[in-house]
């Protein structure tokens, strides 16, 4: 990894520094952690710690890259024993989940990487996706393997977060079987749905305006809008109450008239972002009754929203590290309604009969990882037509659409 080596005693000290840093980063987050805190836990002077790492970010990067290298080695070592593509993907997912389960604190720290070092996050997922690409390219056109690999990553992304972290439960065989059935078969039980593109629809982002009818509430609206812009641009930790007051053109005292502290502002902002997403999605899906049409339209709505209002999604992601309950509430509220609608589709014989809650988190995860890949990791903030169709075909028909000689059809 390019880091210098030390004597046996030095390596032991370095390991203590790393373990201390994991504990501090986990408890406080990157921005609220310091070299002083880390050194204090180990019982070292600051100057001694700097013999091992240049600064806090260097230490953080080391922890994440070490996690990455060990995960990739473990997956690759276990894949060597299999040739069948279905078995390889199953082993990939099982090993990924087991490794995260064994290293929960580090994985929790890693998820903050997109706010600490976006390149670190991009590199990690590119390397993980490359393993899947190597599995898929034996059977699938190179035009689609990258986007499909990210779709597979998304299929288990929120499963890990919901069950291992938010609910602290096991991801049992039934859940893994549900993930695999979705990955290979998609959601379309009838198998005859043909994805189609929808034009982008206008959305001004002010669907919540009716909630601010009184003059006092309009002041609150201004504060929330200003906070949203600042949190989205600078991040929560780098935004101060005084800046919110200045941009809102109100006094600091007025801010505290409506909110006890900055964290309360964040909670309110996340609540309105949640409603905005649902309102915007409804513009696309309101005229459909077939769940497959709704999914086809809903995913495109999410991609358009990500493209135009990606800063809002960034706020939601960051909120989980500032106030866990707020971030978890956002996703669980979406998943709860999603699960109910998917259950209705299953009962009608339209949607594949698997665990609807698992399916809801898999679908949310696909949207998340594709959104991150196309609008956060890339500089241009666009997703091409072929990629959209590949994602939609994957959602509807799974990898089998591509594995049995099928094409990424565009209708």
Report the location of each language-model feature:
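Amphipathic alpha-helical packing segments from all-alpha helical-bundle domains
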Residues: 116-140, 146-147, 324-348, 357-361, ...
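Hydrophobic alpha-helical connector segments
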Residues: 62, 76-102, 148, 268, ...
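A cross-kingdom feature marking solvent-exposed beta-strand/loop segments within repeated
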Residues: 51, 57, 77, 110-111, ...
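All-alpha amphipathic helical-bundle segments outside canonical DNA-binding/catalytic cores
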Residues: 87, 137-154, 170-177, 293, ...
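C-terminal peripheral helix-coil segments that are non-catalytic and often amphipathic
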Residues: 1, 130-137, 168-225, 229, ...
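Amphipathic alpha-helical segments used for helix-helix packing
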Residues: 94-122, 161, 303-325, 370-376
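Helix-turn-helix
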Residues: 16, 20, 24-58, 62, ...
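Alpha-helical DNA-contacting segments of helix-turn-helix folds
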Residues: 61-67, 110, 266-273
């Amino acid at each position: 990894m390019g880091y210098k080596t030390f004597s046996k005693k030095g390596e032991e000290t370095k390991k203590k520094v790393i373990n201390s840093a994991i504990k501090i980063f986990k408890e406080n987050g990157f921005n609220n952690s310091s070299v002083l805190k880390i050194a204090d836990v180990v019982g070292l002077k600051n100057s001694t710690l700097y013999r091992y790492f240049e600064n806090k970010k260097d230490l953080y990067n080391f922890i994440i890259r070490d996690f990455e290298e060990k995960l990739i080695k473990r997956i690759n070592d276990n894949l060597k024993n299999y040739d069948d593509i279905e078995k390889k993907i199953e082993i990939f997912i099982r090993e990924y989940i087991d490794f995260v389960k064994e290293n929960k604190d580090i994985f929790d720290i890693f998820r903050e990487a997109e706010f600490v070092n976006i390149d670190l996050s991009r590199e990690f997922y590119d390397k993980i996706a490359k393993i899947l690409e190597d599995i898929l390219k034996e059977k699938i056109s190179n035009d689609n393997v990258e986007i499909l690999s990210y779709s597979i990553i998304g299929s288990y992304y929120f499963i890990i977060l919901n069950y291992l972290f938010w609910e602290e439960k096991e991801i049992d065989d039934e859940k893994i079987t549900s993930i695999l059935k979705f990955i290979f078969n998609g959601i379309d039980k009838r198998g005859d749905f043909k994805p189609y593109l929808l034009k982008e629809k206008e959305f001004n982002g002010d669907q919540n305006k009716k909630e601010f009818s009184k003059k006092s509430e309009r002041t609150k609206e201004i504060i929330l809008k200003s906070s949203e812009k600042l949190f989205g641009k600078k991040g929560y930790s780098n935004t101060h109450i005084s800046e919110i007051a200045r941009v809102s053109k109100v006094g600091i005292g007025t801010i505290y008239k409506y909110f006890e502290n900055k964290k309360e502002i964040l909670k309110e902002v996340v609540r309105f972002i949640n409603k905005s997403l649902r309102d915007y999605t409804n513009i696309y899906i309101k005229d459909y009754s077939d769940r497959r049409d709704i999914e086809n339209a809903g995913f495109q709505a999410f991609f358009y929203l990500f493209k135009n209002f990606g800063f809002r999604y960034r706020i939601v992601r960051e909120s989980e590290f500032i106030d866990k309950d707020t971030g978890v509430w956002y996703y669980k509220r979406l998943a709860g309604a999603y699960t109910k609608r998917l259950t209705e589709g299953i009962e009608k014989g339209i949607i594949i009969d698997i665990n609807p809650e698992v399916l809801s988190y898999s679908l949310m995860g696909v949207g998340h990882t594709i959104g991150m890949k196309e609008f956060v990791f890339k500089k241009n903030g666009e997703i091409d037509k072929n990629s959209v169709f590949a994602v939609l075909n994957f959602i509807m028909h799974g990898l089998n659409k591509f594995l049995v000689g099928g094409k990424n059809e565009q209708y």
